[in-house]
């Protein structure tokens, strides 16, 4: 059954509109706290901090984060759960600290790459992994119950963890496994998207020996992801060329994704980085299982991996589905074109800083530039058009006769040298129209024609 609030990456929306209101966040904290305590009582939760169950709450740099932090804190306290507040910290840092502190769960206040007017709440399990669908369903069911405050002697307590950033920085450094000399002599430009990694990411690379210049490192609560970060790598590319840097690293607002730029200012996306991670592990004898991409992964990635006898599988779009497929197939590396990359031999969730370190380590081991490392991936032309639709209308539109007929015509024209994909966004009222093939003009023409058909059908 479809969930009312939880999407593919937690709960998300416009601040001040349901469900992103302070009263909802208060109730959400209480409901989640009750569900987690019930799990603990039933013996379904192993990790808890001594005699006082706790959760870790972190956030990115959005102005609204303060409001939701306070509301969630109050909700958990009302349920009788202690709260560890870690402040602005990358999403994967909260996953790591959840395990470190043996908390019942981790809670992240962020809307990832979205603008400041949006925000969201997502949860990590005690193991630092995305919360299971069944637990999210239990939380939604608990939201239907009236909020009942625990007794005055059983209320949760809250405290700030001053060592959170330092702990996370040390964790990131431990995953690098660089050759002797670390990153000495490497010149980096790091774009922190005015987001959660503005303090941690530059420090990680500096402490490993790199020369680091930063952009997008002055958050004011309103400028997160604003013309910067992984969704706007063109500014990073300009800075890399201007400074004569070796590599540029672009994170997003909550720093769970990473896009890179080579020394010539060419953007290197998640598909190309995923190839580099997979080939490096193959050469070091540490690759296990297939590499997992998504339905949106470029055909060029699949062909490059095939040429190296590396198995490739596609999952539904969303890092949680990539994770599930990796676990099911015994794989360790996977990801999305957007830069959500999973290195399960290093971390339990996507981590932009850790992913960048893995690529830099591969460059050092092979004594190659970033451009040379990803050169085997010859990307096929791909056009993606987002069509705004009514909420819940995606299934009806995709089943509409005129849409299906248009898709069939394009597929017949492309034959076995291209792909067509229509899929709804998991977080926004959009239907994504993607066409991929060998000829850029033909691909673009087909994508625009399909998008027009979808728009007309949506307006009918």
Predicted regions and their residues:
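Phosphate-binding and adjacent anionic-ligand microenvironments
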Residues: 246-247, 283-460
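Gly/Ser/Thr-enriched, mixed-charge loops and adjacent short helices
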Residues: 1, 43, 119-243
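Short glycine-centered, acidic/aromatic-flanked micro-motifs in structured strand/loop junctions
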Residues: 57-60, 190-192, 262, 345, ...
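N-terminal small/polar loop signature for handling phosphorylated ligands or for N-terminal nucleophile
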Residues: 38-48, 54-118, 203-261, 409
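General beta-strand structural signal in soluble alpha/beta enzymes
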Residues: 6-7, 57, 83-88, 108-109, ...
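An N-terminal, well-structured beta->alpha segment
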Residues: 1-74, 78-79, 158-188, 394-395
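Proline/glycine-rich low-complexity loops and linkers
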Residues: 93, 137-170, 174, 263-337, ...
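Buried hydrophobic positions in well-ordered alpha/beta secondary-structure cores of metabolic enzymes
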Residues: 9, 57, 94, 107, ...
């Amino acid at each position: 059954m479809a969930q009312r609030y939880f999407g593919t990456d937690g709960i998300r929306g416009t601040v001040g509109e349901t469900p992103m209101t302070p009263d909802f966040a208060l109730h959400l904290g209480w409901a989640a706290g009750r569900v987690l305590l019930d799990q603990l009582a039933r013996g379904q939760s192993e990790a808890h901090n001594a005699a006082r169950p706790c959760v870790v709450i972190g956030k990115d740099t959005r102005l609204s984060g303060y409001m939701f932090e306070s509301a969630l804190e109050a909700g958990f306290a009302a349920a009788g759960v202690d709260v560890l507040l870690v402040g602005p910290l990358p999403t994967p840092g909260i996953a790591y600290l959840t395990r470190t502190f043996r908390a019942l769960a981790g809670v992240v206040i962020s809307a990832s790459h979205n603008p400041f007017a949006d925000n969201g709440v997502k949860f990590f399990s005690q193991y630092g992994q995305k919360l299971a669908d069944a637990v999210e369903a239990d939380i939604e069911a608990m939201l239907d119950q009236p909020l009942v405050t625990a007794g005055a002697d059983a209320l949760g307590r809250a405290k700030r963890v001053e060592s959170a950033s330092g702990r996370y920085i040390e964790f990131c450094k431990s995953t690098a496994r660089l050759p002797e000399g670390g990153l000495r002599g490497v010149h980096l430009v790091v774009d922190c998207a005015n987001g959660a990694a503005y303090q941690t990411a530059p420090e990680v690379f500096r402490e490993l020996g790199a020369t680091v210049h930063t952009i997008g490192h002055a958050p004011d609560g309103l400028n997160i992801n604003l013309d910067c970060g992984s969704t706007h790598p063109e500014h990073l590319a300009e800075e890399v060329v201007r400074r004569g840097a070796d590599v540029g690293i672009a994170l997003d607002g909550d720093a769970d994704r990473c896009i890179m730029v080579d020394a010539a200012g060419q953007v290197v996306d998640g598909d190309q980085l995923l190839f580099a991670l997979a080939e490096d592990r193959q050469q070091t004898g540490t690759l296990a299982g297939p590499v997992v991409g998504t339905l949106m992964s470029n055909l060029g990635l699949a062909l490059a991996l095939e040429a190296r006898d590396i198995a490739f599988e596609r999952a539904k779009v969303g890092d949680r589905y990539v994770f599930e497929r990796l676990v099911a197939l015994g794989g360790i590396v996977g990801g999305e074109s957007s830069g959500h990359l999973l290195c399960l031999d290093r971390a339990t969730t996507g981590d932009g800083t850790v992913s960048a370190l893995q690529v830099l380590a591969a460059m050092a081991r092979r004594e190659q530039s970033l451009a040379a490392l990803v050169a085997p991936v010859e990307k096929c032309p791909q056009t993606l058009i987002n069509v705004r639709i009514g909420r819940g209308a995606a299934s009806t539109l995709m089943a509409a006769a005129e849409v299906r007929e248009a898709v069939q015509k394009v597929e017949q024209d492309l034959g076995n040298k291209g792909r067509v994909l229509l899929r709804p966004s998991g977080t926004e009222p959009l239907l994504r129209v993607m066409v991929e093939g060998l000829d850029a003009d033909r691909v673009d023409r087909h994508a625009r024609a399909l998008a027009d058909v979808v728009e007309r059908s949506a307006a009918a």
